[in-house]
Amino acid sequence: MSGPDHERDGSFERVLAGDPRLEPYRSLRDPDLVRAGEGEGWFIGEQALVLERMLARRGTTISILASGRMAPRAVEIRRASADPAVPILVAEDAVIESLVGFELHRGLLALGRRPEDGRARIDAALADRSRAVALLACEEIRNIDNIGLLFRNAAAFGVAGVLLSPGCHDPLYRKSLRVSIGHALDVPFARLEDLAGDLRAMRERHGLALLGTATDPGAVAIQRLEPPRRLVLLVGSEFPGLSPAAKSACDRLVRIPMARGVDSLNVGVAAAACLSHLRGDLLEAEQPAT
């Protein structure tokens, strides 16, 4: 079906720059308004894969904003989703560029409601002490791409939740969400005001082993570690690494063996390598027999 046919059957609505429904999208130009969105309970996603994941969660998506050339694609994504009544607003490319402050090459945005704080879901995953479980704790990960990559890793390795220190970047910021391919919507997360102290309390309450990634001389090679069934993997920002307080909370510090002259990896790569070792056997056992 062509674009005009979609318009005639009411699949989308053309809008002008002054339409009040476009106002939240304008926040992409202003970092203060982006932070306001975090506090007020909304976020903005971009590109088809993220929109598909947003629309898979009924009630999450408030509206879709598409360029004229992407309107048919937006209609297709919505039709195949769990939320087929979400309005699609179609604007000229120049209008969208004036709203968001940059050329949106893929022509698709969506406004969504933030999921509730993930603390309750994380606590529920930890409740049964006989169950194998892993969490990922992030200390001061301020890089937009890295926070998205860490959530993609968390989803890939069956992590039950992500714990964030106060300085971590918002995982639902549009670029972080895009890097995570929308998985930041699926993996529950919570911010901890005192990461080290709160993790100590969680260890006692839920029987968790706290493993911190580090390049310290005393850190054990991850391959030599028998994976604990219940664990938290702590990662820090790439150059400073974990703080002394976070390291002191850990039961073990672990490292990834590397060639001489290379002392560190991207935090997302390092987390993936560690989680593959810590979770690989469990995930393999869960695969259906072939």
Predicted region positions:
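Boundary-proximal intrinsically disordered activation/regulatory segments immediately upstream
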Residues: 1-76, 168-169
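Active-site/ligand-binding-proximal alpha/beta "capping" segment
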Residues: 211-262
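Short acidic-hydrophobic, aromatic-tinged amphipathic segments that line or gate anion-handling sites
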Residues: 11-18, 87-92, 187-198
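Structured adenosyl-cofactor binding patch, chiefly the S-adenosyl-L-methionine
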Residues: 108-110, 153-157, 171-184, 244-290
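Glycine/small-residue-rich loop that forms an oxyanion/phosphate-binding "nest" at active or ligand-binding sites
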Residues: 80-106
